């Protein structure tokens, strides 16, 4: 008997909703990346997208540990000489809270074609409302919240 290898169409995808209120950003990103990648399933295969859809709500109420709001920076470069921009995570969180959460999660996914395909299953919203109620997402609770 040969070993079973799951194909792309063999997996059934679930929808999970995660409330990010008072959850530390890194802990949220780890759990979301596991769900997106499919590592919680016994049929996990590294070269197949077998993960689930993840909806994150209340991204604007995320928590950061320590002094990261002022001392951690997000860098971007325009491509021109002297075009390096440096913004504190606190400023970025105030303007674009969804972008901070998306960048934290996508940094934990593979940086390949498969990783870009997995990123499409991540939906992040700043407020408590999301348009995916028809998919009947299951609430996923993260046990560790900010102190």
Curated annotation (Swiss-Prot):
HAMAP family: Ribosomal_uL13
The entry's keywords: Ribonucleoprotein, Ribosomal protein
Source organism per UniProt: Mycolicibacterium gilvum (strain PYR-GCK) (Mycobacterium gilvum (strain PYR-GCK))
CDD domains documented for this protein: Ribosomal_L13 (cd00392)
GO cellular component: cytosolic large ribosomal subunit
Organism domain of life: Bacteria
Gene: rplM
Alphabetized GO MF terms: mRNA binding; structural constituent of ribosome
Family in the record: Belongs to the universal ribosomal protein uL13 family.
Protein name: Large ribosomal subunit protein uL13
InterPro entries: Ribosomal_uL13, Ribosomal_uL13_bac-type, Ribosomal_uL13_sf
NCBIfam families to which the protein is assigned, alphabetical: rplM_bact (TIGR01066)
Gene Ontology terms describing biological process: negative regulation of translation; translation
Coiled-coil region list: none
Pfam families: Ribosomal_L13
Role played: This protein is one of the early assembly proteins of the 50S ribosomal subunit, although it is not seen to bind rRNA by itself. It is important during the early stages of 50S assembly.
Subunit structure: Part of the 50S ribosomal subunit.
């Amino acid at each position: 008997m040969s070993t079973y290898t799951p194909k792309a169409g063999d997996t059934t995808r679930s929808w999970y909703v995660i409330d990010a209120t008072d959850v530390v950003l890194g802990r949220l990103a780890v759990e979301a990346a596991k769900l997106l990648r499919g590592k919680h399933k016994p049929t996990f295969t590294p070269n197949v997208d077998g993960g689930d859809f993840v909806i994150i709500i209340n991204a604007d109420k995320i928590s950061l540990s320590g002094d990261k709001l002022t001392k951690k920076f997000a860098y971007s470069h325009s491509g021109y000489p002297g075009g390096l921009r440096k913004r504190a995570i606190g400023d970025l969180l105030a303007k674009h809270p969804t972008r901070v959460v998306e960048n934290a999660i996508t940094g934990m996914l593979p940086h390949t074609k498969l990783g870009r395909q997995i990123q499409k299953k991540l939906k992040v919203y700043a407020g408590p409302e999301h348009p995916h109620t028809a998919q009947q997402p299951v609430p996923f609770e993260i046990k560790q919240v900010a102190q």
